Curated annotation (Swiss-Prot):
Its cofactor is FAD. The keyword Kinase does not apply. The gene is mnmG. Belongs to the MnmG family. It is found in: Cytoplasm. FAD binds at residues 14-19. The keyword Cytoplasm applies. This is tRNA uridine 5-carboxymethylaminomethyl modification enzyme MnmG. One of its GO terms (biological process) is tRNA methylation. NAD-binding protein involved in the addition of a carboxymethylaminomethyl (cmnm) group at the wobble position (U34) of certain tRNAs, forming tRNA-cmnm(5)s(2)U34. GO terms for molecular function: flavin adenine dinucleotide binding. One of its GO terms (cellular component) is cytosol. It holds the Pfam family GIDA. InterPro entries: FAD/NAD-bd_sf, GIDA_C_N, MnmG, MnmG-rel, MnmG-rel_CS, MnmG_C, MnmG_C_subdom, MnmG_C_subdom_sf.
Length: 623
């Protein structure tokens, strides 16, 4: 028996990383939001790795923060170790990563949601979305409550029809021992939404007291802690170490002898797994010549003995897992606290979405996170943020926020999912972007904070900080362009001491910094008028000066890219009547219905010749 339970502008289904960002974004823009979760104890749960950020993922967190999201602030408040990755490489791929205290991360995010003015957080299982005349009307819960909703954001994570697999044991269950959502998939299929089956997995959690760390390599955090959020001032905190060890031939032998019992290899798993996060049995099978694989031991929090064993994800039977783990140096006497498992779950085809993350077929229905076929907390949070913003824009009858590939990694992520689709859990990598040098984690605010402010999400405090930082960078660049370094004897002696050639004539400090062996910091002695600026400002000034030529080339590429992005394709085009298009192109274009020529050009199966046909068609049809 159903009953009327209330009215909301936005209902968010799921309170994981996507759901939390979606709810907070919509609420902060001014919408009345209901966020539903199967368990109030699983808000912003981290059911797999205990860290935020990493290669490309750190960029996503910075971009979420720049737009006004919460993830960066939350990890800055709850991390137990911080490291900057890829520092030996160029600035485009420098990526921040932090170990989280899982419980504190989850509890703080729950507290933020509970205290956000326009948010109501409830323990509710949503079993159906009510649609009327092709538009969202409301949602129905398992307990019979019906809520009117102007928009709905699906952020169901890995819960839809979730199934846990450990060797020959398989049962219906969500991540971390939680309940699965069993009824919503059927409703989505009845609404005409395509459903696929994906798979992911997680390693065991082991007892810290049973680990011999003396046989491992300690991995401490960085001395200089760099925050994720542009709102966070200097961070100082006592950090907790991680540890590195390796598998060996004994480990691999245990796995090889028991591959027939692995669900990955005996056909018990239907779902497609993540290419870039393989199980240990998959790694051993795929790389038979490799005699060892890295294993990182990572703390799950400050006040727990649970340790995450990164690199040993598995779905082998429990007793085989224990035997296999105990062959690893330092884990000879290890005791399991939680068993490793694989999890299968339902997700949708992201090619049925617009770039706003709204369904092409159901008005007012948005989705974000693993339901869209992605993997990872950061990818989920990024999509949730955009879905939440655009649900709010829909309610307020404003244009959606559409991020392009040149705006940020979030734009790349969404464009890849919606335009190219994915046949496996999608993971963000820096190599997926054509404009890596422009999309640095250090300039995320310069790229995106204005956009966040324009949609009403960025607070006045954040906006003021952004303006101050932007102007500091701009004025410092102008200043060093006007600082002339002469070819005096003491200057040349200083340059020679840095293995840099002598000056033959005066040069600006800005030009001098471009020398490969020099940078903004090394030439401080020559810069008499330098004032003490924040480290992040100095870093941005240094990068802008040193890589100016490369940055300008990428900006030229972006301008060419935008010419195609600005050629809009009407949504009502009948591609079957466009003379000259190949049959495959007609099918792909009709399914995906790209917004512009640029998006059309990135669809698999649409050739450059097809793009030429479309350009000619537009020119003649819409003169």
């Amino acid at each position: 028996m159903k009953y009327y339970a209330g009215d909301y502008d936005v209902v968010v289904v799921g309170a994981g990383h996507a759901g939390c960002e979606a709810a907070l974004a919509a609420a902060r823009i001014g919408c009345k939001v209901l966020i539903c979760t199967i368990s109030l104890d699983s808000v912003a749960l981290m059911p797999c790795n205990p860290n935020i950020g990493g290669t490309a993922k750190g960029h996503l967190v910075r971009e979420i923060d720049a737009l006004g999201g919460e993830m960066g602030v939350n990890i800055d408040n709850t991390f137990i170790q911080s490291r900057m990755l890829n520092t030996s490489k160029g600035p485009a791929v420098h990526s921040l990563r932090a170990q989280a205290d899982k419980s504190r991360y989850s509890n703080r995010m729950k507290y933020i949601l509970e205290n956000e003015e326009n948010v109501t957080l409830k323990q509710i299982e949503v079993i159906s979305i009510d649609i009327e005349n092709g538009k969202v009307k409301g949602i129905l819960t398992k307990n019979g409550a019906y809520y009117n909703a102007k928009t709905v954001v699906l952020a169901t994570g890995t819960y839809l029809n979730a199934r846990i697999i450990i060797g020959e044991v398989a049962y219906s269950g969500g991540p971390n021992g939680l309940f699965p959502a069993k009824e919503l998939t059927k409703n989505l299929m009845d609404l005409g939404i395509s459903i696929r089956r994906f798979k992911t997995g997680t390693p065991a959690r082991v007892n810290k007291k049973t680990i011999d760390f003396s046989k491992m390599i300690e991995q401490p955090g960085d001395e200089k802690i760099v925050p994720f959020s542009f709102l966070t001032d200097k961070l100082e905190r006592e950090q907790v170490s991680c540890y590195l060890t390796y598998t060996n031939e004994n480990t691999h032998e245990v796995i090889r002898k028991n591959l027939h019992r692995s669900p990955m290899f005996n056909g018990s798993i239907e779902g497609v797994g993540a290419r870039y996060c393989p199980s240990i049995e998959d790694k051993v099978n795929r790389f038979p010549d490799k005699n060892k694989h890295q294993v990182f031991i990572e703390p799950e929090g400050e006040y727990t003995n649970e340790m995450y064993v990164s690199g040993l994800s598995s779905s082998l039977p429990e007793e085989i897992q224990v035997a296999m783990y105990r062959t690893v140096p330092g884990l000879e006497n290890v005791e399991f606290l939680r068993t490793a498992y694989a999890i299968e779950y339902d997700c949708i085809d992201p090619q049925e979405l617009k770039l706003s993350l709204e369904s092409k077929n159901i008005e007012g229905l948005f989705s974000g996170g693993q339901i869209n076929g992605s993997s990872g907390y950061e990818e989920a949070a990024a999509q949730g943020l955009i879905a939440g913003i655009n649900a709010a824009m829909k309610v307020k009858e404003k244009d959606p926020l559409l991020l392009t590939r040149s705006d940020g990694y979030i734009g790349v992520l969404i464009d890849d999912l919606v335009t190219k689709g994915t046949n496996e859990p999608y993971r963000m990598m820096t190599s997926r972007s054509e404009y890596r040098l422009l999309l640095r984690q250090g300039n995320a605010d310069l790229r995106l904070t204005q956009k966040g402010y324009d949609v009403g999400l960025v607070s006045e405090e954040r906006y003021k900080r952004y303006i101050n930082r932007r102007e500091s960078i701009k004025s410092e660049i102008e200043r060093i362009k006007n600082v002339q370094i002469t070819n005096k004897k003491e200057v040349n002696e200083f340059l020679l001491s840095l293995n840099s050639s002598e000056l033959k004539k005066p040069i600006s400090l800005y030009e001098l910094i471009k020398r490969p062996e020099l940078d903004y910091y090394k030439v401080e002695q020559l810069d008499k008028g330098r004032i003490n600026l924040p480290e992040d400002v100095q870093e941005e000034v240094n990068t802008t000066a040193k890589y100016e030529g490369y940055i300008e080339k990428q900006l030229e590429q972006v301008n060419q890219f935008k010419k195609f992005e600005n050629k809009l394709l009407p949504n009502d085009i009948d591609y079957s009547k466009v003379y000259g298009l190949r049959i495959e192109s007609v099918q792909k274009l009709s399914k995906i219905r790209p917004m512009n020529i640029g998006q059309a050009s990135r669809i698999s199966g649409v050739s450059p010749a097809d793009i030429s046909v479309l350009l000619i068609y537009l020119e003649h049809k819409y003169k």
